[in-house]
A protein has these predicted regions:
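Residue-level recognition of single "structural anchor" positions
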Residues: 1-283
Length: 283
């Protein structure tokens, strides 16, 4: 008969994962096998995605910022080989779209996919469906948003783009650092956006949080995701922790509490309890 992982061990595993530990370092820290760690991640991640899909509704946001962050699964696009797609697998670039409430810091929605018009449109339609009122929306200058935003919101949005102007980087900086930003342009697209609030600072900070707190997003390591399903599960878990379980330093409460979606700070055990499935310890 297989041994079931104790709740204490489950809490240790999930705590390590949301604090930026890789799967293998989590194995070393907790003594739980790699297979069991991944099964727990998969189960809890799906439960977190389902819970947030139901709970994050009718959000009374006023200002929303949207951005997308790059990562990859299996191999970078330039290194993908036919064997990566064996058994229905996926390899290559993966983008995560994020929409954050600039006031409460609640991540209203996220989507994992390609950086293209189709994914942008689907993502923004989901964002629009979770809001209870008209918002001011800011994105970067990517052209895909010019069609995706009106498709999702029509004219019922104050939409602006913050377009960054970049200079040339030196040869060494091109590989390890973004190009030097020389300035920005604020461009009104729909409605009457307030220029004081045309910003992507909060969502860009959230991108940093993702890179810091999910090891599979950290550049120049071998901790990248090997399976798309695990990548998606970790992103759902990360956002559950961010929205419901982690106190924001400035707000002094969680984003979900600030947004009126939760009455308390969730514990890791509560997050795990979203799924009641026992997970057998791998031999």
């Amino acid at each position: 008969m297989a041994n079931v992982i104790s709740m204490v061990k489950k809490v240790a595993v999930i705590s390590a994962l949301v604090e930026g530990c890789s799967v293998r370092s989590t194995v070393r820290l907790t003594g739980v096998s790699k297979g069991a760690v991944l099964r727990l991640l998969s189960s809890v991640g799906k439960a977190c995605a389902d819970y947030q899909d139901a709970a994050i509704r009718n959000v009374p946001a006023r200002r929303v910022q949207v951005d997308e962050i790059w990562s990859y699964v299996g191999a970078k696009a330039k290194n993908v080989k036919p064997e990566h797609f064996e058994n229905g697998g996926y390899a290559g670039d993966v983008w995560t779209f994020t929409a954050i409430d600039a006031d409460t810091k609640l991540v209203i929605s996220w989507a994992v996919g390609a950086r293209d018009a189709g994914c942008a449109a689907s993502f923004l339609q989901d964002v629009a469906g979770r809001l209870s009122n008209r918002i001011q929306l800011t994105t970067d200058g990517h052209r895909m948003y010019l069609d995706a935003v009106p498709d999702a919101f029509g004219e019922a949005v104050d939409f602006a783009q913050l377009v960054k102007v970049y200079g040339d980087a030196t040869e060494g900086q091109k590989r390890y650092s973004p190009a030097l930003c020389l300035g920005t342009k604020r461009i009104d697209i729909i409605g009457d956006p307030d220029h004081k609030f045309i910003s992507t600072s909060y969502v860009e900070r959230q991108n940093l949080n993702m890179r810091m707190n999910m090891r599979r997003f950290t550049r120049l390591t071998n901790a990248f995701s090997k399976k798309l399903e695990n990548h998606v599960a970790m992103i759902a878990l990360f956002h559950m922790h961010h929205n419901f379980a982690r106190i924001h330093q400035t707000l002094r409460v969680t984003p979900a509490m600030e947004a009126g979606l939760s009455s308390h700070v969730w514990s890791i055990q509560e997050v795990i309890s979203l799924t009641a499935e026992p997970l057998a310890k791998a031999a």
